[in-house]
């Protein structure tokens, strides 16, 4: 089945719509991060509280969407959300605390910035450190199950991509406008040729010839 929506590209095999909430009568925030496996730049997380009746035909895991779709969805999420926030943890802090702790720290920053305090957190993945006394549930591939997590996925990805495009202007040799700091062959080749920048994560295997990092 192919689903079409005005101003969007078609998505094939979209079988079921995501869930609007886990618990109906409490305020839930969905949380996700972007940039965990990159060699350069920050890890960025978002927290989003959506109305309980929020529905969307296209919103899903940001990795399944095109850049054009994410850009349109970013504006729709921001205008529809009850509250939203993004949190950044830069590469120096990542090197100090490790990428897992930095990813969760970015989520905490985003949650803390919400104008409305959540009563429950839906966390993408399987690892999280509790935020204050707020209860939470970790959900593997949650960005493909709940709208709030998918919305957080889109915001984290789009805000991080915009940041990487901005710093690309300082160091165009690394093609961050295209690879966004991920360990592509061209990115690693540029590191070997030009060395590292102030935005690179020194605790990562920057000069390894492998094309990706597994966590």
Tell where the protein language model's regions lie, with residue ranges.
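N-terminal amphipathic/basic-hydrophobic helices that include classical n-h-c signal peptides
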Residues: 1-16
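RNase H-like, Mg2+-dependent phosphodiesterase core
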Residues: 12-215
């Amino acid at each position: 089945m192919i689903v079409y929506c005005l101003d969007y590209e078609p998505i094939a095999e979209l079988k079921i719509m995501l869930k609007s909430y886990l618990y109906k009568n409490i305020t839930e925030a969905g949380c996700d991060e972007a940039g965990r496996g990159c060699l350069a730049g920050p890890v960025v997380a978002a927290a989003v509280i959506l109305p309980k009746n929020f529905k969307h035909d296209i919103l899903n895991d940001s990795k399944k969407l095109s850049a054009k779709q994410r850009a349109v969805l970013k504006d729709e999420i921001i205008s529809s959300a009850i509250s939203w926030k993004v949190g950044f943890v830069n590469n120096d802090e990542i090197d100090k605390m490790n990428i897992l702790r930095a990813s969760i720290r970015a989520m905490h920053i985003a949650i803390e910035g919400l104008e409305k305090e959540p009563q429950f957190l839906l966390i993408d993945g399987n690892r999280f450190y509790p935020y204050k006394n707020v209860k939470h549930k970790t959900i593997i591939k949650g960005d493909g199950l709940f709208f709030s997590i998918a919305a957080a996925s889109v915001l984290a990805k789009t805000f991080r991509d915009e940041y990487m495009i901005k710093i690309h202007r300082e160091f165009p040799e690394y093609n961050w406008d295209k690879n966004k700091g991920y360990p592509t062959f061209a990115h690693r080749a540029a590191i070997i040729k030009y060395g590292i920048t102030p935005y690179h994560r020194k605790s990562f295997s920057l000069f390894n010839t492998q094309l990706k990092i597994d966590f």
